[in-house]
């Protein structure tokens, strides 16, 4: 309804006395959406304090690699995360592929990134087991075709669902009309989980800690830029049409690193839910595999080498 500027000023002064009155003023008098921060914004220095020195590209406790790919109009950004028992997380790699997303040359470089091999601390090589690739902002068909190229279970196209309470990831039981499994990622739920883990106090690098998040002492992979992107968002209450809604808002700050972490975490969760991945069992299996004598060592032992092994 029509009102004078003088009345608006009086309404504003009255509203300042009461937070609920302020919400009403913004929603009704100004006709705008009221937003209120629910918690303190996480400082990026909290993440810089979690930097540790890796002994190899993939630290010893890591048993599973996933990746998240964020799609932009002029580039793709991919972050590779390693997972240890208890969902202890280690950032392993960051790859930025510049170029038009619909050009084959650009996509071939993404292919190479997806198939990149990483040296584990035990000397073996690891590849990325599962990828969640964002379909937002570009033609989804681009991601669909790459999913079919790399394997529809290995590379999963995803779309975000900014609805509080949604599962971290929901994978359909059947393929869509394009022949792929288009998964829905509960971005708000994932961010709530991950922010709680990022906020936790750092622990010593040699101490296995469930839910800990660790970053490499390598500025090519992790620096203040990536740390700031990871903490770019904050949880706010948004009042719309008389109803309160919780959501994560980046306030127009860059947040690609966070989006990629969300997708990489979703790739881990779907591996647990759909394929019964057990990180603890996998760790035990890897340990048994690395301590098992090789055929050469067994042959040396049988031939009577010194201490059971030949020189």
Predicted regions and their residues:
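Short, basic/hydrophobic alpha-helical segments
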Residues: 101-130, 146-147
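A residue-level signal for conserved active-site and pocket-lining positions in enzyme catalytic cores
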Residues: 29, 131, 260
């Amino acid at each position: 309804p029509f009102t004078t500027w003088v009345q608006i000023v009086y309404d504003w002064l009255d509203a300042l006395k009461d937070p609920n009155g302020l919400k009403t003023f913004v929603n009704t008098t100004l006709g705008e959406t009221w937003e209120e921060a629910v918690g303190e914004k996480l400082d990026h220095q909290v993440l810089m304090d979690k930097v540790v020195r890796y002994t190899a590209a993939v630290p010893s406790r890591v048993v599973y690699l996933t990746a998240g790919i964020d799609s932009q109009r002029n580039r793709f950004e991919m972050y590779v995360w390693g997972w240890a028992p208890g969902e202890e997380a280690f950032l392993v790699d960051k790859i930025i592929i510049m170029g038009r997303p619909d050009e084959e040359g650009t996509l071939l470089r993404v292919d190479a990134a997806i198939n990149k091999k990483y040296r584990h601390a035990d000397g073996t090589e690891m590849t990325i087991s599962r990828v969640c690739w964002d379909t937002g902002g570009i033609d989804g068909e681009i991601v669909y075709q790459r999913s079919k190229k790399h394997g529809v279970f290995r590379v999963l196209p995803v779309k975000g669902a900014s609805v509080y309470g949604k599962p971290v990831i929901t994978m359909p039981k059947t393929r869509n009309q394009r022949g792929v499994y288009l998964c829905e990622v509960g971005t708000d739920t994932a961010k709530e989980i991950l922010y709680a883990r990022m906020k936790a106090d750092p622990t010593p690098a040699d101490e296995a800690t469930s839910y800990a998040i660790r970053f490499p002492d390598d500025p090519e992979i992790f620096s203040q830029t990536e740390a700031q992107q990871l903490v770019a968002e904050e949880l706010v209450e948004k009042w719309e049409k008389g109803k309160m809604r919780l959501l994560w808002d980046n306030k127009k700050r860059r947040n690609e690193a966070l989006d990629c972490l969300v997708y990489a975490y979703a790739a881990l969760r779907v591996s647990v839910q759909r394929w019964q991945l057990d990180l603890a069992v996998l760790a035990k299996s890897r340990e048994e595999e690395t301590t098992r004598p090789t055929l050469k060592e067994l042959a040396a032992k049988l031939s009577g080498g010194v201490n059971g092994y030949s020189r």
